Amino acid sequence: MKVAVLYSGGKDSNYALYWALKEGFDVKYLVNVESENKESYMFHIPNVHLTELSAEAVGIPLIKLYTKGEKEKEVEDLKKGLEKLDVEGIVTGAVASIYQKSRIDRVCEELGLKSFAPLWHKDPEWILRTVSELFNVRIVGVYAYGLGKEWLGKRITKENIDKLLNICEKYGIHKAFEGGEAETFVFDAPMFKKRIEVVEAEIEWHETWGIYHIKKAKLVDKE
């Protein structure tokens, strides 16, 4: 089956891509939606410019869509972009947001496409542990009390994941960050032919939240 994967470069959309390839789907496109609205209900924001490197690393064409990020209108912008693609299904990294999934399902139904969400209602702790084992995944944004500046740019590993999960438990943070408490970016994965290396980055910090801005990055051979 020919599919497109909605792709932000984060842990969930990379898992969706990993799953689709493992299932034997013919992944024709990665579709990234760039929103002008930093508070977008639908689309992941930090470091989306790096998805071009991600797509190159995987060897799958990237389709960039743009939206002002106005509620509901951004769904129409997604639909307009998807209807041009020669695919039979859409794969997403939706975990628990009924807001997101119901709208993607509706778009797929209207376009006659199948909708796949391999992480839907999976255990959040299982998700975080699985993606951190499969991928080189780093935290690139923190937006919840309890997650401090020290996590920005940090890779989630077997050495620190228990500490991270304990913080989530203590402060009521969703363990897969489904509420937008943190954002991630994947720098290497089994389906990447090369890995992404950060050349230049800076941390923006505002007392209770912050972003790891990747100014420059490049593809390098895997070791």
Swiss-Prot record:
Cited InterPro entries: Diphthami_syn_dom (IPR002761), DPH6/MJ0570 (IPR030662), MJ0570 (IPR005237), MJ0570_ATP-bd (IPR022427), Rossmann-like_a/b/a_fold (IPR014729)
GO biological process assignments: protein histidyl modification to diphthamide
Gene Ontology terms, MF aspect: diphthine-ammonia ligase activity
- What is one Pfam family matched by this protein? Diphthami_syn_2
Q: Which PANTHER family match?
A: DIPHTHINE--AMMONIA LIGASE (PTHR12196:SF2), DOMAIN OF UNKNOWN FUNCTION 71 DUF71 -CONTAINING PROTEIN (PTHR12196)
Q: What is this protein called?
A: Uncharacterized protein MJ0570
User: What organism is this sequence from?
Assistant: Methanocaldococcus jannaschii (strain ATCC 43067 / DSM 2661 / JAL-1 / JCM 10045 / NBRC 100440) (Methanococcus jannaschii)
Starting at the broadest rank, the lineage of the source organism is:
Archaea, Methanobacteriati, Methanobacteriota, Methanomada group, Methanococci
